[in-house]
């Protein structure tokens, strides 16, 4: 491969890493990210945790950087994302025969919305794309000069990649067909005992990464009785058998057409119209020049697209990432057509595509900048305020995304917090309350834990609000704001487990406008203006939209960046408010509010009916039972 391709790869990798580092989430997040951040700091990696390669790299990164686990794992994603973009340069250059075209295609992918958002948080997708691109590159290089050394390199990297994500199996049909088509001695030569043995050894080595997870089963409180049971439990957990059957290839028929609309929205969110058009042209060019490579890219795209399209999960957009990669790769050969117009046409076309990518990066930069996002930490810190294991225990039942954040916060940030899950202690909750009261410890409950306890035990437990946690009403966010203060309120259809309090929303909008405001009924809505006057913008839609306006000479853009029918999980938020090119508000489902100054700096923010809404807390006790407590009771060791 020419040196210029390696130089271009290094340049793009460094530029991408710099971009991701600048917009990096500084710490804790909810959802799977919170789980990864927790597990990487834990001593055991169980089969349920899976991802042995990802966690091995993450643990090494935590040890090398000496950073808190959350920040270190976020940073590892940025580095992996940069490396992935470098690999994309090399693979695209191999497909197109042009380092410039490869670099331009990689830049287009580097600034695509979803990949950028996944490269600034602790997630497996940046490393996944790096390994997909590396596997493809090695396979293409083998086809240039078939030899056992290059074939071993391909087999080894492809097998290694399964330690990060099992969806690498989606590449197997395309890779297999290409190997058979490109084998210089015919397809039968790929089944020679030597090659089969090499492939089997590489596969075994890749599978051996999971020995780490398997071994952890014997270190748990309930170890398996033998290797047979261990393997059954291992397979059940690693492959997520308990929910796989309800999600894979299980999109309801009524939503199939909606998924098509969602995909078109998602594809344009990544590349605009230019990307898909170039990919279509590039695929035609590839088929004409080397039909085997055209078949390879088509099969790789089709398998990953079909899986994501049929995957009934709340964050299907991230599973389209590999298919987006192949769209970007296919765009590179399209640029080489420009040589028919001008002998320097490829370079000119590459520069134009790079400029296009730069314009998209400039436009999306404020919205994708999470460097100032501390919302998850703030939510958990407020929920656990005043708690420590000497004087209190928290019994929680939370949305799973928030609970993952609590797991990290209570194990790494504030390990002195003692907590447990309500489902784990429900059968003996009164005894738990009594025993902790006997040693001077309060028992605090989250809201859903309170509901569960009241339903199970009724008058046997006395439950009252914890005065240490004050949950403001939504309308309180508008109190005492000076007249003329800029604001934006967004209202998105909430998740099914969270209800929208329309009366509270009406009070907020009325307090901001100084008069009643008609409430929205559509899935997406936004209100913007200045306090004391009716909203300058009151827009609602059944489809995602973008609204640009000026509020008191401040340029504001309201972006709805989600497809609510499919999206129940959006780590980057479901939309954004950008004011004066500053990330003023991350929009979530339910109600999101920000008041801000002329420079776009938020003066006050509030959330309701979503996972970032303030969480109430309660204290539970046994009625008419007073626990004698000595003066030293609070200093006794926790029970």
What is the role of each PLM region?
Residues 268-291:
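Hydrophobic, aromatic-rich transmembrane alpha-helices
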Residues 10, 75-96, 134-138, 281, ...:
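Transmembrane-helix motifs of polytopic, lipid-linked glycan transferases
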Residues 287-291, 333-362:
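Signature aromatic-anchored transmembrane alpha helix within multi-pass, membrane-resident enzymes
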Residues 93-99, 119, 135-154, 158-161, ...:
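Membrane-interface transmembrane helices that cradle and orient dolichyl/undecaprenyl
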Residues 6-7, 11, 88-111, 149-153, ...:
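Transmembrane-helix signature of polytopic, membrane-embedded enzymes
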Residues 52, 56, 65-86, 118, ...:
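Loop-to-helix entry region of an early transmembrane alpha helix in multi-pass inner-membrane enzymes
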Residues 143-144, 171-203, 414:
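Perimembrane helix-loop-helix junctions
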Residues 273, 296-298, 306-339:
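Hydrophobic/aromatic-rich transmembrane helices and adjacent perimembrane loops
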């Amino acid at each position: 491969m020419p040196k210029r391709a390696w130089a271009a790869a290094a340049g793009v990798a460094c530029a991408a890493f710099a971009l991701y580092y600048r917009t990096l989430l500084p710490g804790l997040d909810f959802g799977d990210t919170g789980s990864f951040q927790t597990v990487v700091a834990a001593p055991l990696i169980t089969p349920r945790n899976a991802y042995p390669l990802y966690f091995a790299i993450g643990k090494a990164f935590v040890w090398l950087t000496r950073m808190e686990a959350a920040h270190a794992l976020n940073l590892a994603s940025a580095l992996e994302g940069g490396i992935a973009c470098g690999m994309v340069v090399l693979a695209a250059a191999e497909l197109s025969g042009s380092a410039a075209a490869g670099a331009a295609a990689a830049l287009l992918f580097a600034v695509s919305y979803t990949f950028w958002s996944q490269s600034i948080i602790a997630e497996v997708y940046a490393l996944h794309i790096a390994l997909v691109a590396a596997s493809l590159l090695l396979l293409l290089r083998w086809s240039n000069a078939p030899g056992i050394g290059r074939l071993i390199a391909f087999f080894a990297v492809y097998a290694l990649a399964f330690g990060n994500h099992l969806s690498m199996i989606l590449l197997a049909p395309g890779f297999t067909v290409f190997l058979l088509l490109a084998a210089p001695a015919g397809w039968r030569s790929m089944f020679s005992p030597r090659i089969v043995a090499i492939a089997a050894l590489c596969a075994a080595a890749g599978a051996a990464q999971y020995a780490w997870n398997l071994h952890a089963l014997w270190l748990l409180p309930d170890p398996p009785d033998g290797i047979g049971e261990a393997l059954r439990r291992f397979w059940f957990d690693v492959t997520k058998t308990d929910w796989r059957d309800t999600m894979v290839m299980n999109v309801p028929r009524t939503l199939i057409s909606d998924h098509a609309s969602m995909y078109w929205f998602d594809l344009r969110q990544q590349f605009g119209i230019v990307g898909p058009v170039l990919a279509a042209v590039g695929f035609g060019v590839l088929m004409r020049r080397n039909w085997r490579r055209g078949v390879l890219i088509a099969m790789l795209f089709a398998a990953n697209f079909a899986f994501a399209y049929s995957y009934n999960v709340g964050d299907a957009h991230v599973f389209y990432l590999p298919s987006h990669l192949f769209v970007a790769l296919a765009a590179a050969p399209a640029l080489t057509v420009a040589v028919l117009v001008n002998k320097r046409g490829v370079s000119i076309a590459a520069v134009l595509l790079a400029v296009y990518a730069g314009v998209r990066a400039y436009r999306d930069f404020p919205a994708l900048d999470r460097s100032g996002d501390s919302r998850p930490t703030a939510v958990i810190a407020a929920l656990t305020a005043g708690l420590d294991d000497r004087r209190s225990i928290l019994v929680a039942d939370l949305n799973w995304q928030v609970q993952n954040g609590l797991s990290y916060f209570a194990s790494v940030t504030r390990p002195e917090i003692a907590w447990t899950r309500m489902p784990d202690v429900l059968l003996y909750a009164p005894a738990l309350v009594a025993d902790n009261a006997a040693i001077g410890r309060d028992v605090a409950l989250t809201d859903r834990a309170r509901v569960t306890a009241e339903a199970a035990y009724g008058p046997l437990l006395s439950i009252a609000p914890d005065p240490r946690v004050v949950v403001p009403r939504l309308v309180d966010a508008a109190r005492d704001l000076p007249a003329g203060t800029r604001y934006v309120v967004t209202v998105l259809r909430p998740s099914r487990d969270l209800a929208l309090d329309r009366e509270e929303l009406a009070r907020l909008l009325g307090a901001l406008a100084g008069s009643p405001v008609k409430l929205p009924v559509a899935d997406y809505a936004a209100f913007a203006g200045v306090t004391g006057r009716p909203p300058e913008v009151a827009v609602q839609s059944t489809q995602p939209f973008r609204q640009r306006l000026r509020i008191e000479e401040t340029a504001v853009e309201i972006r709805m960046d989600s497809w609510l029918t499919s999206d129940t999980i959006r780590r980057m938020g479901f939309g954004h408010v950008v004011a004066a090119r500053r990330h003023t508000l991350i929009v979530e489902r339910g109600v999101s509010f920000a008041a801000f100054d002329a420079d776009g700096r938020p003066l006050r923010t509030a959330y309701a009916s979503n996972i970032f809404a303030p969480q109430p807390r309660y204290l539970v006790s046994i009625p008419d039972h007073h626990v004698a407590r000595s003066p030293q009771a609070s200093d006794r060791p926790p029970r």
